[in-house]
């Protein structure tokens, strides 16, 4: 791990606890871009840039002002790590901020005229939804990039690559379009069909191959996003891609709606009504189509995308193993799911704010006068000229919603008269009526409410005349139109009236005429709140302004959105004459604040600043007033580089506050230093009262810090000359100017600071000295200067890194050599025990590696905290030159660690296929096995790395048909892939190789892997009720009994119950026998001690009384001591405690004979008959073990009738059979479950002859009865005493052995024998031994009643290994101790038996047998 990854806490460590004896770590190297993300610029900027753009939008030159303000905000919130600065990551990204802000301002520039938009509400709805989705996408973008980089499954990778290509094109082309000016923007959106971006995006929802919709549904339909286990990272990555792709799909939807809405309004404002209608239709169609695809409409869509994705996420959340999942990607999905749910609900309820139906073009045009009192208007007047064609169209409007526009009416040719009467159909909605002369731009002529259906087409002509540039002509026409009935209060585009039109043109005489008709028009606002005084002030119509003020216009009136007064507008435009005129009005608020808190003085700080001088010198304007973000006019003067305005402010007699801070703690001097405005800095520092050491809020930056940080070195030098400058001042993280100068690589600033008395080794909060930081910067002069100045060459950061670490990591060969020459410690370790050699290797710097190894060859074996040594790291990074060099110095690619693992093993566990390939290509022996006798291929299978598995097979690095543990490597590989729930590997074997050995369905059922069970049943078509060939057992019974925990209660898990439920659903008859030994699901649950499964089976129709070879379930449970099963059967399922088997024995007989005292007591408590007689009139006490017999006797004679002397069928105790050897009999094993599952039940005679409770451990099936234990012990006795055990006593009570019992005991003994030989034999020759043959011979000996022949047979196999030295005997003893849980100190060996297995089996024996003690 590179020092930078460690230091920045950005390394990705995945520790795999499944690897025994070795912590396994997989990592991803960070790029510089990754490291730099610690600036958190994206997250900070997303929330602030929009705010900044909005805050300063009222300011002239807002784009210039916004960037440094945003940067100042970033300084207050962003990272301040000196190391990041040295890596050139913390230089505030001015260009990026400026670019993003310019995009914001471009969007403002492209905005259509407010109030003239028919689809304004649609645009706002789409923009709001689009922005919220984009914010979600930004938050998840890094995760998606990680998915692309790490996905392993070839099929999934191909799909996700296709999704990424669509997303990238969407992002890139969208940015390309957004950067264009309005007209070019529109042209790009309306390109011909072949290259039209919007049409391309619309195809995203089609089912054609390669579309975003089809790719997302490939993930869904192939169930690639559903993990099979907690380690199924590929599925989680696919789920993340599905989620991110769905977000993009929604984003595309609202982007399209927004763009078509924009185009519609663009054409609406430009009078191109046909194009408005066309884009209106596109917008509506896109919304409906995408909404249907996303959430369905009236449930007619069976698989709506969002619903399906949310359903998959819910299914994954309900996976029982999901609680064990450790995935940042999954956590991000879950965190964002709430947002997707909210979005689904919003889209479900969402309707476009439009009117669906289109008006009819029913227009009646009448030029005849209705009243003789209203004079006719003859042509020509305005556009009414003879021969001109005029036509009309209609649009509905209601509550801000608009319809399409009707077709044009039949055109009428103008002749002698103008201004006809228009009659249209009545409607409950308002109707907008448009008029078009010839091919000129259409214009709105009237808005009719629901009660109107007739009007005279004259009012728009008054509006048009009012804004004519010729005042006298305009006045004459307006008077004529008003006399003919034109309404002075009629509204048109943007809600403007004729008074607004006259203000635009400055026609005060027309305004006087209008106000004479309706004085209420004086302060009338348009839709945006602009009054005639606003318009006149902004248009510099001074006479009109004076006229309005004389008439009593409100001088402090504000616009609706930005709350601008007329004075704001005049000051912003630098219209000094208007400012002076407005200031003459009594009551004017010269310090009125607009929405962002800016006063007119703030807005007047422009390049010319004439209005600013007026406001400062001739008005009571406050010069220290702050905006909402804390900016004073002096701040704005600096931000706009307006020194003249600054001087006016400073020199005024109003006492400007030089050190006033904005909300981020930035003074004007901070901004001047950050921007590199040297003239400003010199001017400010020459003024009395300036605080050159002022610190920002939170981060404590001074102007000197900022000048150095932003690399404004001329400003920094100027500040360093100021008399009272503090050169050692500390910002956040204890960063001094010296640290920044070293980090930014300016040796001259470093020299100046040191020559001024700064301490060379002062440390940041993270322990960095200037030397550390200088080495990290590309400049090489600075570290040399610092070393010459006596900097500590062994100084350590808080994580223990020295300058040598950084020089090694960055490949600074000359600096590294200089440090070594000066005596730097080449063995210095940081907190993860990383030395410079590790840094050099992991970053591929061969020259430095050579320097270190030649200096000290012992560094070849230097290990860090994760036991990684140079050769390991060279292999991991695949640096061939470093790898070859280390090999030439003695590194061995096949060297084994304490667990017998080579590098090839370790990287197979990690799943790093490229490293595995690299190692094999460079001499790694792929045939080597570790101490668990596993090859790199075995480990790849076990840990689920299908890429390595495929590589090994396809490149012939493994012989699948090679004999291994009695089968083949392929057989065990398939078994293991199922056992460890590695779905990708399973798919590779089954689908790619078409191999299905090992009864995979039974194996999956045994290990309770539900998804694999479903895969084999549903996708591979395996019969879920068929018996397997090896053991003749159904999947259901195997699932019930279970592996790897076998017959212990802890294996009765919810996951296993899920599998049982699934298989029961596939099983026609739940009471049918499920193996060849007549076992039923119920009897299997009893034997397996699976209480919850037993209860489920009975609840679902299983017969709790169905006998197996004559034994009812309660009898079996009592016989083997399953207390919880007995209790459940009696209490929950009301089974008779005195039920009998076919020999008439009761459960109490069975429990007492095996001495299960807890069951005995419980049965008696529940009413069991202690005098019940079975075969040969035997009572429970006749068969009872010691404890049970004592308990039964203690109950008193009141319970017993005609008690006869007890007949004991007990086996002789071990110490009676073997006086010299006494040991415990618990034995363990580890093997494929299907190879040793015992599917039979105990025979009715077994309980008479043995105490056969089934023992088990958490991780493996551990079941063997006393007879089986004696067989194994006989072999051990022969090993140590050359005596044979006497089975007479034990065999005498055995009437028969069932096939399944004999098979189970033979399998277990075979496994024990394999373990014993593994403990003795270190080489691979044991792999050639056919243990299936061993099992077959043991099974025949047991089934034929010849257990004494087993030891001889085992000896015959052991003869192949004739040399057993004392050390091997000791190992054998230790292995036996492990397998049997018997302490070696408990084994008593009589010294007179001086010969052992070695003589009995014909082997060489050691000289001192007593070493086995």
From Swiss-Prot:
Record's keyword terms, sorted: ANK repeat, Cleavage on pair of basic residues, Exocytosis, Membrane, Neurotoxin, Presynaptic neurotoxin, Repeat, Secreted, Target cell membrane, Target membrane, Toxin, Transmembrane
Function per UniProt: Crustacean-selective presynaptic neurotoxin that induces neurotransmitter exocytosis. May bind to crustacean neurexin-1 homolog, adhesion G protein-coupled receptor L1 homolog, and receptor-type tyrosine-protein phosphatase S homolog, and induces neurotransmitter exocytosis both by forming tetrameric pores in membranes and signaling via G protein-coupled receptor. This recombinant protein form channels in artificial membrane bilayers, that are stabilized by calcium ions and allow calcium flux at negative membrane potentials.
Assembly mode: Homotetramer in membranes.
Domain remarks in the Swiss-Prot or TrEMBL record: The H8 helix is predicted to insert into membranes and form pores by assembling into tetramers. The helix is contained within a helical bundle domain that undergoes significant conformational changes during pore formation to allow exposure of the H8 transmembrane helix and transition of the toxin from a soluble monomer to a transmembrane tetramer.
GO molecular function: toxin activity
PROSITE patterns: ANK_REP_REGION (PS50297), ANK_REPEAT (PS50088)
CC annotations in GO: extracellular region; host cell presynaptic membrane; membrane; other organism cell membrane
Annotated organism of origin: Latrodectus tredecimguttatus
Spans through the membrane: none
Region (Helix H8 is the probable transmembrane region of the tetrameric pore inserted in the target cell membrane): 238-257
Subcellular location field: Secreted; Target cell membrane
UniProt keyword Mitochondrion present: no
ANK repeats by residue range: 457-490, 494-524, 528-557, 562-592, 596-625, 629-658, 664-694, 699-729, 733-762, 766-795, 799-828, 832-861, 866-895, 899-928, 965-995, 996-1026, 1031-1072, 1077-1106, 1109-1139, 1143-1172
GO biological process, one term: exocytosis
Source taxonomy: Eukaryota, Metazoa, Ecdysozoa, Arthropoda, Chelicerata
Positions of the pro-segment in this chain: 1-28, 1193-1413
Keyword Amino-acid biosynthesis part of the UniProt annotation: no
Tissue specificity as recorded in UniProt: Expressed by the venom gland.
Coiled coil: none
This protein's name: Alpha-latrocrustotoxin-Lt1a
PANTHER family per the UniProt record, alphabetical: ANK_REP_REGION DOMAIN-CONTAINING PROTEIN-RELATED, PALMITOYLTRANSFERASE HIP14
């Amino acid at each position: 791990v590179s020092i930078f990854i460690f230091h920045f806490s950005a390394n990705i460590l995945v520790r795999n606890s499944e690897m025994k004896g070795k912590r396994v770590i997989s990592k991803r190297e960070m790029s510089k871009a990754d490291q730099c993300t610690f600036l958190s610029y994206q997250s900070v900027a997303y929330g602030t840039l929009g705010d900044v753009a909005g805050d300063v939008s009222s300011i002239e030159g807002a784009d210039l002002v916004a960037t440094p303000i945003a940067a100042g905000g970033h300084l207050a919130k962003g990272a301040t790590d000196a190391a990041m600065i040295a890596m050139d990551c913390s230089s505030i990204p001015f260009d990026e901020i400026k670019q993003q802000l310019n995009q914001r301002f471009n969007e403002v520039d492209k905005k259509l005229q407010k109030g003239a938009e028919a689809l304004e509400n649609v645009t706002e709805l789409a923009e709001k939804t689009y922005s919220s989705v984009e914010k979600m996408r930004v938050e998840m973008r890094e995760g998606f990039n990680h998915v692309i980089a790490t996905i392993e499954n070839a099929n999934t990778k191909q799909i996700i690559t296709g999704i990424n290509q669509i997303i990238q094109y969407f992002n890139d082309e969208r940015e390309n379009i957004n950067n264009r000016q309005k007209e070019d923007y529109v042209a790009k959106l309306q390109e011909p069909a072949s290259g039209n971006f919007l049409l391309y995006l619309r195809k995203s929802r089609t089912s054609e191959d390669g579309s975003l919709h089809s790719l997302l549904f490939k993930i869904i339909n192939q169930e690639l996003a559903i993990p099979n286990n907690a380690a199924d990272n590929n599925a989680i990555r696919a789920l993340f891609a599905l989620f991110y792709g769905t977000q993009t799909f929604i984003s595309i939807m609202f982007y399209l709606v927004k763009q078509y809405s924009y185009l519609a309004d663009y054409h609406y404002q430009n009078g191109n009504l046909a194009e408005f209608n066309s884009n209106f239709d596109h917008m509506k169609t896109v919304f409906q189509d995408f909404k249907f695809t996303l959430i369905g409409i009236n449930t007619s869509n069976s698989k709506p995308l969002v619903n399906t994705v949310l359903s998959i996420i819910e299914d994954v959340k309900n996976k029982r193993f999901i609680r064990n999942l450790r995935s940042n990607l999954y956590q991000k999905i879950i965190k964002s799911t709430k947002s997707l749910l909210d979005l689904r609900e919003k889209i479900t309820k969402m309707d476009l704010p439009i009117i669906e139906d289109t008006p009819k073009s029913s227009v009646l045009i009448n030029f005849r006068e209705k009243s003789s009192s209203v004079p006719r208007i003859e042509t020509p007047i305005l556009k009414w000229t003879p021969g001109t064609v005029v036509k009309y169209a209609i649009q509905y409007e209601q509550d801000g919603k608009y319809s399409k526009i009707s077709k044009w009416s039949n055109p009428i040719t103008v002749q002698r008269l103008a201004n006809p009467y228009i009659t249209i159909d009545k409607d409950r909605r308002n109707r907008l009526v448009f008029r078009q002369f010839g091919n000129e731009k259409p214009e709105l002529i009237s808005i009719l409410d629901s009660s109107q259906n007739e009007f005279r087409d004259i009012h728009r002509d008054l509006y048009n005349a009012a804004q004519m540039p010729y005042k006298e002509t305009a006045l004459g026409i307006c008077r004529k139109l008003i006399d003919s009935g034109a309404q002075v209060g009629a509204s048109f585009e943007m809600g403007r009236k004729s008074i607004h039109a006259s203000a635009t043109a400055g026609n005060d005489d027309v305004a006087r005429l209008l106000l004479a008709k309706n004085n209420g028009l004086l302060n009338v606002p348009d839709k945006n709140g602009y009054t005639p005084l606003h318009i006149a002030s902004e248009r510099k119509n001074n006479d009109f302004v004076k006229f309005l003020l004389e008439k009593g216009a409100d001088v402090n009136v504000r616009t609706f959105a930005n709350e601008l007064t007329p004075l704001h507008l005049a000051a912003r435009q630098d219209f000094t004459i208007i400012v002076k005129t407005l200031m003459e009005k009594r009551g004017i608020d010269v310090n009125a604040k607009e929405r962002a808190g800016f006063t007119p003085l703030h807005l007047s700080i422009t390049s010319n600043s004439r209005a600013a001088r007026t406001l400062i010198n001739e008005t009571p304007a406050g010069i220290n007033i702050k905006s909402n973000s804390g900016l004073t006019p002096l701040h704005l003067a600096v931000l706009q580089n307006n020194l003249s305005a600054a001087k006016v402010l400073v020199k005024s007699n109003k006492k400007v506050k030089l050190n006033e801070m904005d909300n981020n703690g930035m003074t004007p001097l901070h901004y001047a230093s950050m921007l590199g405005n040297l003239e400003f800095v010199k001017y400010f520092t020459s003024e009395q009262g300036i605080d050159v050491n002022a610190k920002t809020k939170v981060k404590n930056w001074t102007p000197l810090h900022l000048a150095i940080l932003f690399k404004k070195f001329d400003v920094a030098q100027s500040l360093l000359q100021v008399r009272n400058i503090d050169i050692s001042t500390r910002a956040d993280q204890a960063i001094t100017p010296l640290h920044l100068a070293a980090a930014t690589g300016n040796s001259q600033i470093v020299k100046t600071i040191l020559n001024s008395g700064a301490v060379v080794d002062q440390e940041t909060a993270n322990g960095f000295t200037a030397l550390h930081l200088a080495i990290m910067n590309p400049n090489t002069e600075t570290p040399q200067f610092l070393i010459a100045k006596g900097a500590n060459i062994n100084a350590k950061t808080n994580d223990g890194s020295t300058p040598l670490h950084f020089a090694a990591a960055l490949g600074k060969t000359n600096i590294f050599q200089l440090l070594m020459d000066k005596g730097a410690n080449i063995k210095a370790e940081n907190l993860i025990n990383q030395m410079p050699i590790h840094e050099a290797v992991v970053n591929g710097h061969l020259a430095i590696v050579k320097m270190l190894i030649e200096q000290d060859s012992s560094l070849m074996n230097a290990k860090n905290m994760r036991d990684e040594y140079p050769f390991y790291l060279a292999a991991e990074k695949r640096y061939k030159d470093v790898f070859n060099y280390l090999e030439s110095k003695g590194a061995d690619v096949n060297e084994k660690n304490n667990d017998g693992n080579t590098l090839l093993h370790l990287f197979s566990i990690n799943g790093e296929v490229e490293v595995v390939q690299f190692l094999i290509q460079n001499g790694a022996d792929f045939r080597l096995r570790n101490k668990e006798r596993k090859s790199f291929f075995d480990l790849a299978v076990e840990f689920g790395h299908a890429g390595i598995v495929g590589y090994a097979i396809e490149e012939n690095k493994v012989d699948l048909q090679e004999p291994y543990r009695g089968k083949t490597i392929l057989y065990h590989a398939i078994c293991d892939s199922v056992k460890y729930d590695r779905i990708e590997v399973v798919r590779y074997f089954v689908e790619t190789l078409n191999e299905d050995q090992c009864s995979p369905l039974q194996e999956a059922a045994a290990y309770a892997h539900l998804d694999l069970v479903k895969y084999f049943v549903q996708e591979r078509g395996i019969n879920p009720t068929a018996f397997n060939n090896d053991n003749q057992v159904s999947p259901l019974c195997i699932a019930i009994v279970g592996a790897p925990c076998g017959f212990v209660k802890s294996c009765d898990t919810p996951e296993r119950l899920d599998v049982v439920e699934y298989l029961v659903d596939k099983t026609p008859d739940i009471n049918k026998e499920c193996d060849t030994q007549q076992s039923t699901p119920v009897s299997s649950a009893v034997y397996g001690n699976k209480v919850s499964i037993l209860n489920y089976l009975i609840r679902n129709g299983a017969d709790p009384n169905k006998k197996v070879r004559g034994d009812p379930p309660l009898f079996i449970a009592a016989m083997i001591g399953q207390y919880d099963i007995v209790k459940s059967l009696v209490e929950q399922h009301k089974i008779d405690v005195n039920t009998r088997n076919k020999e008439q024995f009761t459960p109490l007989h069975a429990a007492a004979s095996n001495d299960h005292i807890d069951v005995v007591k419980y049965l008696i408590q529940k009413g069991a008959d202690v005098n019940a007689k079975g075969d040969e009139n035997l009572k429970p006490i006749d068969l009872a073990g010691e404890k049970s017999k004592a308990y039964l006797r203690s109950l008193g004679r009141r319970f017993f009738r005609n008690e006869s002397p007890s007949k004991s069928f007990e086996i002789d105790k071990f110490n009676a059979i073997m006086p010299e050897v006494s040991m415990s009999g618990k034995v363990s094993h580890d093997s494929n479950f299907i190879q040793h599952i015992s599917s039979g039940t105990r025979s009715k005679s077994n309980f008479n002859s043995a105490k056969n409770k089934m023992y088990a451990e958490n991780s493996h099936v551990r079941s063997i009865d006393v007879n089986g234990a004696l067989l194994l012990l006989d072999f051990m006795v022969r090993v140590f005493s050359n005596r044979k055990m006497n089975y007479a006593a034990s065999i005498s009570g055995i009437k028969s052995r069932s096939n399944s019992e004999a098979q189970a005991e033979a399998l277990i003994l075979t496994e024990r024998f394999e373990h014993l030989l593994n403990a003795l034999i270190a080489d691979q020759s044991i792999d050639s031994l056919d243990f299936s043959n061993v099992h077959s011979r043991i099974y025949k000996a047991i089934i034929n009643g010849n257990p004494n022949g087993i030891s001889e047979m085992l000896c015959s196999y052991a003869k192949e290994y004739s040399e057993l030295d004392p050390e091997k005997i000791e190992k054998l003893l230790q292995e036996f101790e492990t397998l049997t849980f018997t302490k070696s100190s408990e084994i008593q060996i009589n010294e007179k038996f001086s010969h052992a297995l070695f003589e009995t089996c014909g082997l060489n024996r050691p000289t001192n047998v007593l070493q086995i003690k």
